[in-house]
């Protein structure tokens, strides 16, 4: 007989994301679009462009994973129900009378609920990406990690293409160069679920899904309640960097010291030469006067 914990985790892993969790994901994604400078005015001026941007935020992970697996990038359009649902969320968010949706979303409990439900969908996307990649490349763990990462956090990456088309792209805002917290935590989850799928972790999938979801939901709520934009992995990253690349630091410090000493020696030798020349001239003048 299974324990209550296993029964709870198994029931949680069988929870359907449609429609409530998908609605929360679309709402948070569309609200992120609306909060961009000039997004509301663009929706009235060019609604097609605004709708396209919102769909990239909602389905960016699926689009990126399709591109990586050489599948049709417009495959997400085949799911008419989700497209209509996301489009409805976009419409009422931008064109609701008196901006009621944005006013309701401005309350912190509503934001906490929607953001927490969105993080639940992140777990399902990572697991779906890892499983889908395994159907193409059996136990190809690098591909599985990449597709799981793309499926879970591809929305923040694929939107760089949208900014490039609009002329708002900046190199310092590239997700590949400066990874955000969602991208890092999704990459961590993709690695963990890949190892579990390849049987390198002795834990069941439903238990891992439950534990990982609790972790990302708790950290997201903590970030929002404490009003911190990121929860850094800096201690772990610094430790890993020291373990892998720390041996290079002594050599680099020695090189810097040698470079610092060499200019000073050169300056001293150059400065001593005029003094020696001046002393020789004074001696010559003194001898001439004596003569």
Swiss-Prot record:
Coiled coil regions in record: none
The protein, known as: Trimeric intracellular cation channel type B
Physiological role: Intracellular monovalent cation channel required for maintenance of rapid intracellular calcium release. Acts as a potassium counter-ion channel that functions in synchronization with calcium release from intracellular stores. Activated by increased cytosolic Ca(2+) levels.
Signal peptide: none
Principal subcellular localisation of the protein: endoplasmic reticulum
Membrane topology: Multi-pass membrane protein
Protein family membership: Belongs to the TMEM38 family.
Binding site residues for a 1,2-diacyl-sn-glycero-3-phospho-(1D-myo-inositol-4,5-bisphosphate): 118, 122
Any Gene Ontology CC annotation: sarcoplasmic reticulum membrane
Phosphoserine: modified positions: 262
Subcellular localization, as worded in the UniProt entry: Endoplasmic reticulum membrane
Subunit structure: Homotrimer; conformation seems to be controled by binding to diacylglycerol (DAG).
GO biological process, one term: extracellular matrix constituent secretion
């Amino acid at each position: 007989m299974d324990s209550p914990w296993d029964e709870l985790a198994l029931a949680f892993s069988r929870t359907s994301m449609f429609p409530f969790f998908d609605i929360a994901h679309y709402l948070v994604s569309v609200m992120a679009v609306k909060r961009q400078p000039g997004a509301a005015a663009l929706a009235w001026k060019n609604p097609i462009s605004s709708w396209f941007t919102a769909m990239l935020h909602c389905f960016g992970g699926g689009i990126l994973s399709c591109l990586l697996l050489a599948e049709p990038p417009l495959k997400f359009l085949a799911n008419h129900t989700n497209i209509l649902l996301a489009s409805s969320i976009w419409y009422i968010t931008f064109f609701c009378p008196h901006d009621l949706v944005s006013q309701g979303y401005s309350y912190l409990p509503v934001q906490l609920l929607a953001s927490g439900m969105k993080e639940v969908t992140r777990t399902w996307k990572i697991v779906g990406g890892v499983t889908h990649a395994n159907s193409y490349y059996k136990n190809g763990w690098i591909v599985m990690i990449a597709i799981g990462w793309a499926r879970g956090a591809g929305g923040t990456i694929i939107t760089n293409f949208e900014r490039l088309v609009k002329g708002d792209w900046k190199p310092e805002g590239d997700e590949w160069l400066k990874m955000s917290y969602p991208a890092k935590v999704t990459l961590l989850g993709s690695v963990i679920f890949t190892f579990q799928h390849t049987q390198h972790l002795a834990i069941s999938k439903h238990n891992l899904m439950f534990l990982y979801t609790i972790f990302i939901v708790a950290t997201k709520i903590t970030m929002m309640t404490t009003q911190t934009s990121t929860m850094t992995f800096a201690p772990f990253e610094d430790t890993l960097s020291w373990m892998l690349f720390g041996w290079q630091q002594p050599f680099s410090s020695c090189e810097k010291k040698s470079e610092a000493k060499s200019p000073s020696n050169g300056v001293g030798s150059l400065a001593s030469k005029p003094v020696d020349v001046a002393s020789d001239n004074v001696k010559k003048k003194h001898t001439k006067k004596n003569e």
